[in-house]
Each structure stands twice: as structure tokens, then as C-alpha cells.
Regions:
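Hydrophobic anchor at the beta1->P-loop junction of P-loop NTPases
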Residues: 24
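Conserved lysine of the Walker
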Residues: 32
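N-terminal pre-Walker A segment at the start of P-loop NTPase domains
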Residues: 1-15
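Accessory nucleic acid-recognition modules appended to NTPase machines
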Residues: 200-371
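Short glycine-rich substrate-engagement loop in P-loop NTPases that contacts/grips substrate
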Residues: 54-85
Length: 438
């Protein structure tokens, strides 16, 4: 099992004096259940696990009473160990299937804060927005979980190389031996992506298993569309989801409704886009032509790009074979750029860097991401390889003179005045590397 960084956040949650019941959000199969079980086994004397989509009787308990002591007592009868305050982690999985259990968290917070309760659900984001029940606003803690990062993948694949990776503490170029080995590991990660079951197949060098598992996950997502949306909305969700590869195949990546379906209009597909966002399956990045703080005030919500939650899923959704990453075929060059952008976004978001805007100046220049950091706006350009020609970042610098410019590419780590080149495989270390800029 991967050593997930979110375990540290869970440990901090456990020790908080003002701890509330936890709602862990995240797309299906990013590893929420396995992480919570490991956390319960390692950090508590006991772990009581209930899956509310499989155990209908458990949901009945929440329907019949709102008293947390009575709920705890009845749940204890269903486990081999008593559920004890401070000593037991109570895990309520797939809680979106039991709205009464979500509502009950208010009473757990107010009346029995000594009990550690962690809730998870693949479609909790949808439940918050669309189910007709009372959500316990202010009575729960939230935590977001994402696919396995490259750094987590690297630790499992090569512990020694991971130690070096985490020890990088300057902007000096990496020695060739480390750069080359990290590049090789990164190629493996880009093929598999970060869905835990898939990434583990890659660790085991089971390439056939990688492809099969990715296809199975995509099939599960398609079934979710049908199960959790009306027939009309499910059809539109599927159209948007399947259009993702063609949306990113264009040079400017801007979302075009005509690629979803001929004659499609925004008002018909807005709900489908929102559904995919709330389910954690896509990221939406809006145009911001005036990169001033706060970026939110200058965004154009009508012009945007969408990306997948995971670069491995995007590759298979686009029907690209793993060999594409090992080829220098110019036909694949443009889509390599899209996959590189998707990876950088995935890495930044997972590591706590809000990345929801890009910059463009007409049709002449575009910077893939701009990130607000305090009172500064940092432009971030993404290149998939070692060919880094292009004038967009130069044009941005000429117009706005930012304190820092970042380019991600497969060139070595380098600092030149206010410009920093970060190898794609070091994106997980972006926050630390920015801190080394003087």
C-alpha cells in the first residue's frame, strides 16, 4: 500500500481539541476507504467500519434516531469490539447513500465530540448540492483526497531515489544520474497515473493490469452517471466526459460545446459540467485576461478549459497506448502537451496550490496557469519535453513584470533572475522550490 501524505493530516485531525466528525471528499477509487482503514488500525485501538451502500440495516439505525449515544450503542452490537470514545475510529463509508447519517453528524459534533467519526463517499459533492436533506453546516471537518502523487509513487517504487527527491533544497541543476532516473520513474507514472490500484500495477510492472484497471475505472464512472443522475442528465454528462480528449487536443484547449455534440449550447450542458466537478472527476480552469489580485474578480467564467482528475485516466479515455510516451512521433507531440498540463494541474491541486485560472492575450499568447500567492500572481508555463520555444511567458513578463515566472518542462532545474525552470517530475515540490527563490 502506498504511504499517503494525507495520513499526516488525519493524525493532526485526531489530535485537535476542537475535532468534529470528518467528511472525506474524493472521486471514486482514489483510496479513501483504504486510507481511513489504515489510519484506524495504526492510530486507534479499534476501528469500526460500515459501508452504508451495502448495509441497509445500518442506515435504518440513523433513520430511527438522531441520538448519537443510541446510534453508537446499536452500531456496537454489529461489531466485534465496543465503539469507545477516543479509542475507536468509526468509519461510515459511502455516506452519501444515507442522508440521515450525514444529518446526524450535527449531533455527534454537539453531544458526543469525544467519539472519532470519519465519513467518506465517492459522490459526497453531489449529495451536498442535490439531495433534499439538512447538511450539518459548521458541524463537520472537511478533507479532500486525490489520486496518488508522483512523489508517493516514487517512494513505493524506489525508496532511495525518493529520499534524494525529498532532499532537494536548492534551485541548482540536478546531477545527470538523478535527473535520468527520476525521468524514467516519471515516465512510468505518466503511463499509469495515480489511481492507487493502477499505480500499484505499474509498480509491479504489470502493464496489462494497468490498462485493464484503468478501463474498469472508466466503466465504473460511466455506471455512476446512470445511477446518480436522471437519464437526460446522465446522457449529457457522458457526452461531456467523452469529449475531454478532443477538448484538450486543440492547441488552445478552450472548452468548445460543439465538440460535446453538434449544436450543443451552454445552457444545456452547464449541469453536466457541474455534476462532473462536484463528483471530483474534472477540474475547471477559467480565463483571466487581467492577472491582478484577487484573480477571482477578473475571471471570465464563460471561457474555460477542463482537465481530468488523473493523467492515466485521460490517456486511456483518449485511447492512447503506453508506447506513445516512449515515442518521438511528432503526431503525438500536441497531445503530450495536453497530458503534461493535466499532470501539472493534478500535482498542484493535490499539493494544496489552488490552480483555477489561465491567462491569454487574444490569440497571440497563452500561459497555461496563473496562481495567486499572497499579493503576487505567478505565471506557470507547461512544456512537455525539452523544446521550450515560445513567446507567451516572455510576453506575459513584458506586460506585467511578475516577481516570479515558472516553466515546467523536461529540462533540468534552473534559476535565472525571476525565472525558474522546474522539471515536470518535481512539480510536487513546487511550494518548497518557490521558497528557495531569493
Amino acid at each position: 500500500m502506498f504511504n499517503r501524505a494525507i495520513i499526516q493530516e488525519l493524525e493532526q485531525w485526531k489530535e485537535r481539541r476542537d475535532r468534529k466528525p470528518l467528511m472525506m471528499l474524493g472521486a471514486r477509487q482514489v483510496g479513501k476507504t483504504s486510507v481511513l482503514k489504515k489510519f484506524g488500525e495504526d492510530s486507534f485501538e479499534h476501528c469500526a467500519y460500515f459501508s452504508l451502500d451495502e448495509e441497509e440495516g445500518v442506515c435504518d439505525i440513523f433513520r430511527k434516531t438522531k441520538n448519537p449515544q443510541q446510534i453508537i450503542e446499536q452500531l456496537s452490537y454489529l461489531t466485534s469490539e465496543p465503539i469507545l470514545p477516543h479509542k475507536t475510529l468509526l468509519i461510515l463509508d459511502e455516506i452519501q447513500d444515507c442522508p440521515e447519517a450525514i444529518s446526524a453528524m450535527k449531533y455527534f459534533c454537539e453531544k458526543t465530540p469525544e467519539y472519532a467519526v470519519a465519513c467518506a463517499g465517492s459522490l459526497l459533492g453531489l449529495a451536498f448540492g442535490h439531495q433534499g436533506f439538512s447538511f450539518p453546516v459548521g458541524k463537520v471537518d472537511h478533507m479532500n483526497m486525490y489520486p496518488v502523487t508522483f512523489s508517493e509513487f516514487l517512494e513505493q517504487r524506489d525508496a532511495g531515489l525518493y529520499q534524494y527527491y525529498m532532499s532537494i533544497d536548492s534551485l541548482e541543476p540536478l546531477p545527470d544520474v538523478f535527473f535520468d532516473r527520476l525521468s524514467q520513474a516519471f515516465t512510468a507514472y505518466r503511463i499509469s497515473g495515480g489511481m492507487p490500484a493502477v499505480a500499484m500495477k505499474m509498480i509491479e510492472k504489470d502493464l496489462e493490469g494497468v490498462e485493464t484497471t484503468l478501463r474498469n475505472i472508466l466503466q465504473d464512472y460511466s455506471l455512476d452517471f446512470v445511477k446518480h443522475a436522471t437519464p437526460l442528465l446522465a446522457n449529457r454528462i457522458s457526452h461531456v466526459w467523452r469529449s475531454l480528449p478532443s477538448q484538450l487536443a486543440k492547441e488552445n484547449r478552450k472548452f468548445v460545446y460543439q465538440l460535446v455534440r453538434p449544436g450543443a449550447r451552454a445552457r444545456e450542458y452547464e449541469d453536466a459540467l457541474t455534476w462532473l466537478q462536484n463528483a471530483g472527476l474534472i477540474y475547471k480552469v477559467s480565463l483571466c485576461s487581467t492577472p491582478q489580485v484577487p484573480l477571482k474578480s477578473y475571471e471570465d467564467l464563460s471561457i474555460f478549459k477542463i482537465y481530468s482528475l488523473d493523467v492515466g485516466l485521460l490517456r486511456v479515455l483518449a485511447e492512447l497506448s503506453p508506447e506513445a510516451y516512449l515515442s518521438d512521433n511528432p503526431i503525438f507531440k500536441e497531445y503530450k502537451g495536453a497530458l503534461a498540463e493535466n499532470y501539472i494541474l493534478q500535482s498542484l491541486v493535490t499539493n494544496g496550490i489552488k490552480c483555477s485560472h489561465y491567462w491569454a492575450s487574444g490569440n497571440t499568447a497563452e500561459v497555461e496557469f496563473i496562481v495567486q500567492r499572497g499579493l503576487d500572481v505567478i505565471p506557470m508555463e507547461v512544456k512537455s519535453g525539452t523544446s521550450v520555444t515560445g513567446r507567451s511567458l516572455i510576453e506575459y513578463n513584458r506586460k506585467y513584470s511578475p516577481h516570479l515566472r515558472i516553466r515546467y518542462s523536461m529540462l533540468n532545474l534552473k534559476k535565472d533572475d525571476t525565472f525558474v525552470n522546474i522539471p515536470l517530475f518535481l512539480a510536487d515540490r513546487t511550494e518548497q522550490l518557490i521558497g528557495y527563490v531569493q
